């Protein structure tokens, strides 16, 4: 009895010692991610650091025993994710502060390791606590009647109506005016997805043609989009009740999340193609999950819907094509490794390839019908353009006279001096597609040669142009200083907000309009601790990535495969022109699905 007591006491002392050591490591490791607010001494020589240490010791002393006694697999995955998270936090802090990461600074790697050691037991605990909470969340009484699809759809749509009237006729922003101009001028290009150009511009121009005015056309498009987007979100909630046993109370919570959290109504009334694109991606992912759980039901009822959603996903955004095509081999490989039913896996591959063929055929027909011009390369070359411009700005001596001459052939000096590390729009608009097309090999070689000499400059050019997608503390203000039709971007460019010509804003609820203006253009929600993270693309991605890593830990490989289009879509925006919420809207839409996907299937 005494031996057992001594053993327990030693274990307790050991756990406490572990908690103290790891807490100190984590407190020191946080120095790198806190330095963004100023000199690191403001953190290291502060009472706040002591509070962090004290609270960490208490928390870790409660959970470290469970982590240390967990399986080797759990520890490995926890350390992998924690290391990646720590690296993201440290690099992101440096990029936010100085638009640069010093990869030769050994302290960076030391701080990354220390913080990773601290985060690992916390990550492990969150995985376990999350699974326990989900099992309680998805328990439904046998006699409990949930909400049906139409009820959920109506509730979400109605909750969005005040925002629609506050921003009436809708937020006609981003590429909307360009797409409308293509329609009225009958001069089309492949720069924007033709299907969306014809749909948006066609509805607005038709309203003008029959005498109702552009505002009516924009309002009609907005209401139709609200109907489609709310229907897809309603389908997601209804499916969670039908398949996972989500009870009525938690259905209502999901409805309120979709109906009231500002990002959803904000993009429901926004004319950008991203809203309908996101709706299609969500349907594709949900149906992929259904396929992995019940293939026979999928092929009996849902395969046509899957093909339709897949085709429209590719029609609405070009990077949707890249993500979808990349997902085919990813799903195939995971399916083979995980020993998924070969017949059903083959049928899924055929459906996905068929969807791609239908997309190509549809897009080609639209191109022929509209005589759309092609031959633009700057969107695909956004990152190389930024990399060359960064070297030109910070290390111009790298270029020889001949290389400088070649650079000016595709990027005139007047544009090179406009280099902005966080957005490439102005710079890439000066890219000479014709010159590049004449000798791609020469200019590709120029890019490669300069990169071999300045690899860290290239790496920083890419990271600073995309870090907001994986770093939670970035203030999204990529358009700062840009004059728009009705305002100038100053402190924030979180959302476009305005109604551009040919539309005109007529708000019925000015106070609500003011709230959304604050969210969009000012440091409003960013000033509120914790709440600010819910609006941050980087934070939402960390939640998504942590969930995926948890699925891998639990060997739920087919669920990982089902989410692969979202991960691959996220990967494509890392190669994009800038950092905006609209490009990763799917990360918020997928949250309720993530919450419930660990629950066992329940027949309702």
List each model region and its residues.
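Short acidic/glycine- and proline-prone juxtamembrane loop motifs at membrane-interface regions
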Residues: 266-277
